[in-house]
Amino acid sequence: MKAERSSILGIIPARFNSTRLKGKPLMKIGDKTMIQHVYENCANVLDHLLVATDDQRIFNEVKGFNGNAIMTNKAHLSGTDRCLEAIHLWEKNQNKTFSLVFNIQGDEPFIHEDHLHQLISCFEDNKTEIATLAIRVSDLKELREGMVYLVKDNTDFAMYFSRFPIPFNRDMPLSLIHISEPTRRYR
């Protein structure tokens, strides 16, 4: 049977044993968990959405609010690795292939539909293979340890990413904060 072609799959990698904050996806923000906020904020924009997790508690939480979830291997070193496994499992399970796959951070409960539309618009140019969201930082108060920063060239191509503000000017850093994992065209 030939696989049905569909356009956009969003994957939210989520693990319970986070290095910086254990159990983060299940932490409550108001009356919902963080993972539910992220999921619901993305659900109306993407054709397909799922949480890729290695933890039964997260899986059960997602199923509890009628979301899609898939169990992945605990050995993954990154969320991107978890997404890659999830793509293959989900495409096989759903008998579909996807032209775009979004890796959506599970700890971005305030992600907005506009952010996703902005990413989708990047792919109107068929040459685009990968895109990421970032905002300019110009206030010292916005700089925090552990955030991901990026340097881009004059054509908006990311040159490199760092967990430290880059480039650093003692008087006024000028960095971009990376606010989303890369999104790429998937074939």
Where are these regions (language model features)?
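Conserved donor-nucleotide/metal-binding helix-loop-beta segment in metal-dependent transferases, i.e.
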Residues: 113-139
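Short, high-confidence coil segments that cap the C-terminus of an alpha-helix
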Residues: 46, 96-98, 127-129
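N-terminal glycine-rich phosphate-binding loop and ensuing alpha1 helix
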Residues: 4-53
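Single conserved hydrophobic/aromatic residue that forms the stacking wall/gate
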Residues: 177-187
